[in-house]
Amino acid sequence: MTAAHVHLLLNHIPILGSIFGLLVLSYGMLRKSDEIKKTSLGVFVITALLTIPVYLTGDGAAQIVSNLPGVSTAIIQQHDQAATITMVAIEILGAVSLLCLCLSWRSRRELRSWMTLAVLILAMISSGLGAWTGSIGGQIRHTEVRAGFTK
């Protein structure tokens, strides 16, 4: 299995994990359920961990596909830059989520509202960045989604 295979296998996890966690967190906030909010924090931590191999296999995947017909090196570079920004955002989200979990377990208290709000904002940013990165990545092999595509 090549880096391209692994990258394609895992590349939806950062996007879907961020969005799923955001939905769970939003639901927990609406229900005022600390347990649901803590579940979303766990989702963000797991997503952050699984984002690492996605990012690390990106260069190997780029090397494999860069010589294929119809593949744009410029789009690969755009995707790489977007992926770096997204990776940093998701890792920050995961670290803050882990910190919030640790603080709530240590103090045996409910999550503070500022913690939940901070994670919510980071999750929205990470989800948006993930969608942006995925959109650029999709253009690498799917010419039909590139700007200016005509039949």
Predicted regions and their residues:
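Polytopic transmembrane helical bundles with strong interfacial aromatic enrichment
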Residues: 1-151
